[in-house]
């Protein structure tokens, strides 16, 4: 029997095992087809963008490694993304930052317009990919001292307010073009390296700046505003203006989407435990699935306990319709297309695993006080044949099963990536 036949045979056996514990595999696979992951563009070029100034990455962001093949142009980045999407089962999104526009000449960030992203809109339509967006509040002279929307200088603050206003207009145009809301996520690096004398004033300025940016209302069918918190960053170890409490309150009071990044909290703190709590009070949630190693290092997402817990909480709470799943990692030490494939496939595997969990049976045991049975079933289901179901899912949508996708990447690396030369990939 050939490999395809073996995959189907293994799937039939796996389906029987899951049925034995009350799990409808076919229903889970049907739900999987509606799951969209927002794949981040910045993994492909080490967060450099296309503004043309080749400025250093700043404001607490760092990319390490010098693996050859970094995308240097929009065409190269789009080519890399097309390969990555072909290796990932399902229809997914692209998350763009504002510094990735098609700029002909110097265009400052408060001057960007829809026309600078029309090429991306056209490409996304052709690729059947939906777009999400982000203002870029970093790696710019007006962010050199670590402050943007909370800056004490009203002129600098207004520059960044205008950038946010421009980005919302672009996001709305993207959403209108794709007939689906473009999630527009706001993260700013503002904070102090050492203990501040005034924690209140910067937060008041940030709230006022955000209110100014959001003053114009756009239809929810076009764009949704998200706000993202962080505990600390390089250069803002002692104080971050946009803390979790700040943005939680802001999202609740202004009816905005809250963004939780898996790497933006203390290393012993997990966002999986926060999901059911915040979903009681905010309309929708944006997840930045990442992997921090001792700090917000943005390692490639692996199939970790926390990744599984995040997706379990999303599925158990029946939040798939209100939670937007995005990725946020950047690693220049390995093949960048492979990084996309590994991280996105792992995120999807975790969603599938959560959909294959005997959740109702576990809840029944818990309500009846059968905590022994709950633990036993939770542990037993960990070794059920998820891989067989995953391989079937990949094969059913003409995507390489198992590690077969790696050969596609190797070939692309040999034929395409190896022809690129860029010594600046080491940051």
From Swiss-Prot:
Cofactors required: Mn(2+)
Pfam assignment, any one: RhaA
Subcellular location: Cytoplasm
A GO CC annotation given for this chain: cytoplasm
Enzyme class, first EC level, given as a word: isomerase
UniProt keyword annotations, A-Z: Cytoplasm, Isomerase, Manganese, Metal-binding, Rhamnose metabolism
UniProt cofactor note: Binds 1 Mn(2+) ion per subunit.
SUPFAM superfamilies in UniProt: Xylose isomerase-like
Binding site for Mn(2+): 264, 296, 298
Record function comment: Catalyzes the interconversion of L-rhamnose and L-rhamnulose.
Family stated for the protein in its record: Belongs to the rhamnose isomerase family.
Name of the protein: L-rhamnose isomerase
Species the sequence originates in: Rhodopirellula baltica (strain DSM 10527 / NCIMB 13988 / SH1)
